[in-house]
């Protein structure tokens, strides 16, 4: 057998040498007859240039064939040097013919994912797979309600080519395993991999199953190709456990579940689903679990204990994968025996409860590899590089609209970025949905990394629910996560929804952010604020009372919260309206933007507010942009407005067009805190082109408003012309 393998290796090496020589000779002939042929192609093609194109194409084909043969040769050499799969303890070399995965063969991967934290972890896993892959992928995600909401929206907005996602309801599978006591930190979800023959479609014959704490360092197609090595009764592909857990010698009186030798780790599994169904897998694992639980009482390592008990009884079911397909970084691991250099690593498994803080002499190397994908820009993975035809690719309306844009349009950048598809990760951190209350109100705001310091301040002023949209890069999202987890103030709050919108383009998509925060509020009313404003103490309860006093059957209302500002970074915050009026009189506070944009808030009628004791009505006026409390189902913000200029004005205009009644609250206020000018406001002030494009967008908005609301909207156009 070994001689046969070496003969095949020599044959492939000879083929590779001859192919390389033929390619070199072919290229040399082309250069001799037609001159240098691989330079840029001229605009006007001659017979010579056509030949150059053909020659270049054939050269690429030859290089691809060369690469494929090199890979196949390398695999055969690896098989000569390393033990093949089989039962535990089999170190003989099996020179089996291993066909490479077909170029466009669809690879199926199943992952159990539940909760907010697991939804973040699975993104890093998927990034590592997508980065290395050369094949189409179909992800089968078994999720709870939280992960379903988060991941469905994330993948819909990510729009990765040649990637299909299917979701399966974990709640429907829980009854199958709920009877099993489990001490593992994964809880009931750690047992659901046992149910995959039932959960996944009957047409699916094989699948790779992964834990969420996995990082790939190679193409997953290499793992998929190992299915072809299964023989006889083998239906499970697993890596041996790399700790002494199942040997029972970790501590005194340690009694693990039964296992074959060291046992096997289930962080990476190859499942032959069709064969498992034929042998009655569901009954097999259930009977085994019932038998062992009579003595063990509960599982310690969730599904892994039951898989190992089954394998102990039926060892012919398992194909042992090489250990580099699951390098385990558990607390008692011996995984360093699996690799001698970085090139040996294929899959890293962070299977310690301590995750990145696990003690391991090579942990810095592994952590660096993990952080590479954690902070990698996921938008780069949208690029189609594998060249496989795709069925049912996501081709949103925005893509069609983008293709219709005129690149000669002076405002092309504004139009293109308003149509950009941003990845959206809802509920980036765990939070609770508020208890239903007809008068409850959520503070809605958006921010970027440079405003992060405002979060703790706002939390001290507003005890109610918040929905915050954060515009971050992948790396900044991790900085925010560390900041939030280290903050006692933020950690003490369970009623704040943080929704990450990943950066794309140069302009700040302010109204997209507002809409994401607005749509993901879970109370009947919302307070549409900005991150630079501190609410008065007690504003949350004040607004709830004001809402309760409104007639819910009348016309829709927008309750205006008067806005003020200070130029002082250190401010003794007013505790009441009387304190605020005193500070207003002494010059410690001002009405908001009175010195640069007075008409933005002048219709609030601050003179009347000073003495008002009941809400009073004001009329809409051009450029009015107050901060308001409205029902959560109010009109969304117009996303054509990016950066600075008219993003709030347009929204108030739409509220007025829908006949919202504007009421100023007499005992409520917010104060704007000073900060350095944003990039967008600096651009607006310095660039005439920027201001001209904002004006163009304003005019188009007026036209759209007239089409939607007819003659009632003509007053806005008239008011604009009279300014």
From Swiss-Prot:
Q: Which reaction does it catalyse?
A: 3-O-[beta-D-GlcA-(1->3)-beta-D-Xyl-(1->4)-Rib-ol-P-Rib-ol-P-3-beta-D-GalNAc-(1->3)-beta-D-GlcNAc-(1->4)-(O-6-P-alpha-D-Man)]-Thr-[protein] + UDP-alpha-D-xylose = 3-O-[alpha-D-Xyl-(1->3)-beta-D-GlcA-(1->4)-beta-D-Xyl-(1->4)-Rib-ol-P-Rib-ol-P-3-beta-D-GalNAc-(1->3)-beta-D-GlcNAc-(1->4)-(O-6-P-alpha-D-Man)]-Thr-[protein] + UDP + H(+); 3-O-{(1->[3)-alpha-D-Xyl-(1->3)-beta-D-GlcA-(1->](n)-4)-beta-D-Xyl-(1->4)-Rib-ol-P-Rib-ol-P-3-beta-D-GalNAc-(1->3)-beta-D-GlcNAc-(1->4)-O-6-P-alpha-D-Man}-L-Thr-[protein] + UDP-alpha-D-glucuronate = 3-O-{beta-D-GlcA-(1->[3)-alpha-D-Xyl-(1->3)-beta-D-GlcA-(1->](n)-4)-beta-D-Xyl-(1->4)-Rib-ol-P-Rib-ol-P-3-beta-D-GalNAc-(1->3)-beta-D-GlcNAc-(1->4)-O-6-P-alpha-D-Man}-L-Thr-[protein] + UDP + H(+); 3-O-{beta-D-GlcA-(1->[3)-alpha-D-Xyl-(1->3)-beta-D-GlcA-(1->](n)-4)-beta-D-Xyl-(1->4)-Rib-ol-P-Rib-ol-P-3-beta-D-GalNAc-(1->3)-beta-D-GlcNAc-(1->4)-O-6-P-alpha-D-Man}-L-Thr-[protein] + UDP-alpha-D-xylose = 3-O-{(1->[3)-alpha-D-Xyl-(1->3)-beta-D-GlcA-(1->](n+1)-4)-beta-D-Xyl-(1->4)-Rib-ol-P-Rib-ol-P-3-beta-D-GalNAc-(1->3)-beta-D-GlcNAc-(1->4)-O-6-P-alpha-D-Man}-L-Thr-[protein] + UDP + H(+)
Q: Spell out the subcellular localization from the entry.
A: Golgi apparatus membrane
Q: Which GO terms describe its biological process?
A: protein O-linked mannosylation
**Residues that carry a glycan:** 91, 117, 169, 241
Q: Which UniProt keywords apply?
A: Glycoprotein, Glycosyltransferase, Golgi apparatus, Manganese, Membrane, Metal-binding, Multifunctional enzyme, Signal-anchor, Transferase, Transmembrane, Transmembrane helix
Region described as Glucuronyltransferase activity: spans on this chain: 383-723
Q: Which Pfam families match?
A: Glyco_transf_49, Glyco_transf_8
User: EC number(s)?
Assistant: 2.4.-.-, 2.4.2.-, 2.4.1.-
Top EC group:
transferase
Q: Name one GO molecular function term.
A: xylosyltransferase activity
Sites binding Mn(2+) 2 sit at 530, 532
Q: Which InterPro entries match?
A: Glyco_trans_8 (IPR002495), Nucleotide-diphossugar_trans (IPR029044), Xyl/GlcA_transferase (IPR051292)
Q: How does it sit in the membrane?
A: Single-pass type II membrane protein
Known role: Bifunctional glycosyltransferase with both alpha-1,3-xylosyltransferase and beta-1,3-glucuronyltransferase activities involved in the maturation of alpha-dystroglycan (DAG1) by glycosylation leading to DAG1 binding to laminin G-like domain-containing extracellular proteins with high affinity and in a phosphorylated-O-mannosyl trisaccharide dependent manner. Elongates the glucuronyl-beta-1,4-xylose-beta disaccharide primer structure by adding repeating units [-3-Xylose-alpha-1,3-GlcA-beta-1-] to produce a heteropolysaccharide. Supports the maturation of DAG1 more effectively than LARGE1.
Report what the protein is called. Xylosyl- and glucuronyltransferase LARGE2s
Organism of derivation: Xenopus laevis
């Amino acid at each position: 057998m070994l001689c046969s393998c070496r003969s095949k290796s020599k044959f492939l090496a000879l083929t590779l040498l001859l192919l390389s020589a033929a390619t070199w000779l072919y290229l040399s002939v082309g250069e001799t007859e037609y001159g240098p042929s691989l330079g840029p192609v001229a605009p006007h093609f001659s017979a010579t240039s056509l030949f150059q194109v053909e020659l270049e194409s054939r050269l690429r084909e030859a290089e691809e064939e060369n690469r494929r043969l090199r890979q196949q040769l390398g695999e055969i050499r690896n098989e000569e040097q390393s033990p093949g799969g089989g039962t535990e303890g089999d170190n003989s070399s099996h020179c089996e013919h291993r066909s490479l995965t077909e170029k466009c063969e669809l690879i199926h991967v199943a992952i159990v994912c539940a909760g907010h934290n697991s939804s973040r972890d699975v993104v890093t896993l998927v990034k590592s797979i997508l980065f290395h892959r050369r094949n189409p992928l179909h992800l089968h995600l078994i999720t709870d309600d939280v992960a379903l909401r988060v991941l469905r929206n994330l993948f819909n907005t990510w729009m990765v080519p040649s990637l299909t996602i299917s979701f399966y309801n974990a709640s429907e599978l829980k009854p199958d395993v709920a009877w099993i006591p489990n001490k593992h930190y994964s809880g009931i979800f750690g047992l659901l991999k046992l149910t995959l023959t039932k959960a996944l479609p009957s047409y699916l014959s094989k699948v790779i199953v992964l834990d969420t704490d996995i990082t790939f360092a190679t193409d997953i197609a290499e793992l998929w190709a190992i299915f072809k090595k299964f023989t006889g009764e083998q239906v499970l592909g697993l890596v041996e456990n790399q700790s002494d857990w199942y040997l029972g010698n970790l501590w005194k009186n340690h009694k693990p579940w039964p296992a074959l030798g060291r046992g096997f780790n289930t962080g990476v599994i190859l499942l032959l689903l069709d064969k498992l169904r034929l042998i009655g897998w569901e009954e097999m694992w259930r009977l085994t679990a019932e038998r062992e639980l009579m003595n063990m009482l509960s599982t310690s390592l969730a599904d892994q204990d039951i898989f190992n008990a089954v394998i102990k009884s039926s060892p012919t079911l398992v194909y042992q994968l090489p250990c580099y397909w699951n390098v385990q970084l558990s607390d008692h691991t011996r995984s360093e025996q699996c690799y001698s250099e970085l090139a040996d690593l294929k899959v890293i498994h962070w299977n310690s409860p301590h995750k990145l803080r696990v003690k391991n002499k090579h942990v810095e190397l592994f952590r660096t590899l993990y952080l590479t994908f954690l902070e990698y820009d996921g938008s780069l993975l949208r690029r189609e590089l594998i060249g496989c035809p795709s069925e049912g690719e996501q081709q949103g309306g925005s893509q069609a609209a983008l293709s219709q844009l005129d690149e000669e349009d002076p405002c092309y950048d504004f139009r293109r970025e308003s149509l950009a598809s941003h990845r959206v990760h809802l509920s980036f951190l765990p939070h609770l949905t508020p208890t239903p209350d007809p008068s409850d109100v959520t503070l809605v705001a958006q921010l970027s990394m440079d405003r992060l310091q405002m979060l703790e301040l706002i939390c001290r002023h507003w005890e109610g629910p918040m929905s915050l949209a954060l515009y971050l890069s992948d790396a900044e999202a991790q900085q925010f996560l560390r900041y939030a987890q280290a903050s006692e103030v933020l950690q003490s709050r369970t009623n704040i929804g943080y929704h990450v919108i990943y950066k794309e383009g140069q302009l700040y998509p302010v109204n997209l952010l507002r809409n994401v925060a607005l749509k993901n509020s879970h109370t009947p009313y919302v307070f549409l604020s900005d991150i630079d404003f501190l609410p008065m103490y007690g504003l949350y309860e004040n607004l709830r009372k004001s809402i309760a006093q409104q007639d819910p059957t009348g016309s829709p209302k927008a309750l205006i919260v008067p806005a003020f500002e200070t130029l002082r970074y250190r401010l003794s915050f007013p505790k009441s309206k009387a304190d605020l009026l005193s500070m207003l009189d002494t010059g410690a506070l001002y009405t908001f933007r009175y010195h640069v944009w007075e008409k933005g808030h002048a219709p609030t009628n601050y003179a009347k507010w000073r003495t008002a004791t009941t809400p009073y009505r004001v009329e809409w006026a051009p450029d009015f942009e107050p901060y308001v409390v409205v029902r959560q189902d109010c009109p969304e913000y117009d996303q054509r407005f990016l950066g600075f200029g008219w993003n709030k004005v347009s929204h108030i205009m739409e509220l007025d067009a829908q006949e919202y009644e504007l009421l100023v609250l007499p005992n409520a206020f917010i104060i704007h805190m000073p900060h350095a000018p944003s990039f967008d406001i600096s651009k607006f002030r310095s660039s005439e082109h920027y201001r001209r494009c904002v004006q163009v967008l304003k005019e188009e908005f007026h036209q759209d408003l007239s089409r939607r609301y007819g003659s009632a909207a003509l007053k806005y156009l008239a008011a604009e012309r009279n300014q």
